[in-house]
Swiss-Prot record:
EC number(s) given by UniProt: 2.8.2.-
InterPro entries the UniProt entry points to: Nod_factor_sulfotransferase, P-loop_NTPase, Sulfotransferase_dom
Originating organism: Rhizobium tropici
Disulphide linkage map: none
Bilayer-crossing regions: none
Pfam families documented for this protein: Sulfotransfer_1
Domain of life of the organism encoding this protein: Bacteria
Listed name of the protein: Nodulation protein H
Amino acid sequence: MIHSLPSPEPFVILAMPRTGTHYLEALLNDHPNILSNGELLNSYDENWPDKDRLRHSDRELLELAYMRYPPAKKKVTHVGCKINEPQFYERPGFFDELARWQGLKVILLTRNTLESLRSLVQARQTGQWLKFSPDRNEPPSVSLSVNECEAYFKAADDFHARVKDAFDPSKLLMIEYQDLLLKPSACLAAVLAFLGAPAHRFSNRATIQRQETRSLARSLRNFVELRRHFAGGPYAKFFELDDASAPQG
């Protein structure tokens, strides 16, 4: 169905993989007027009843996201979805179509890129992408090659630059993963103000759990080797953070 005018204001959450987008979306969906419908370009996302939607054109997909979105049991004034960087490779023209969508506001979620890559490799190895209940099982420690680190770091830099170049600064809000986990109430308030949605008290009802609580030095088997290789370069910052007490996952 096409929802009656006035249409909800559109937004999108953009990020590299494993940067806390599920957690941010859970916080937003707790708001009585905000609806975020998961990964538009993920054919397995259960938010979308149309399992054949990826056969549609880019424009039709965006109309599905912002005009024909799944019904919700609340008055929706802001509607959105999220897209991870690798999903744009499968639809080369989709980013430009997204950038042309009138009135779109963009939330760019960022994270220490080394943490993002380590978490991605762990999830691929275990097949566990989300964790909804606490347990004592730790994800496996992993090793990363210099080449895969360099490729991933560059992909993240290029993606962040592309987003910043494509959208007016007034339509773009950047949120850091660590701030989201350590200061969720303040981050949520900033996002709501950016979207123009009414203030809403942080409820802490999100059930998503951190999968990795160890530092990079403990969860990455060749951390010292990689830190030595990248020392003095533009990516040294990913190894210099004191993340021993920072939430991760």
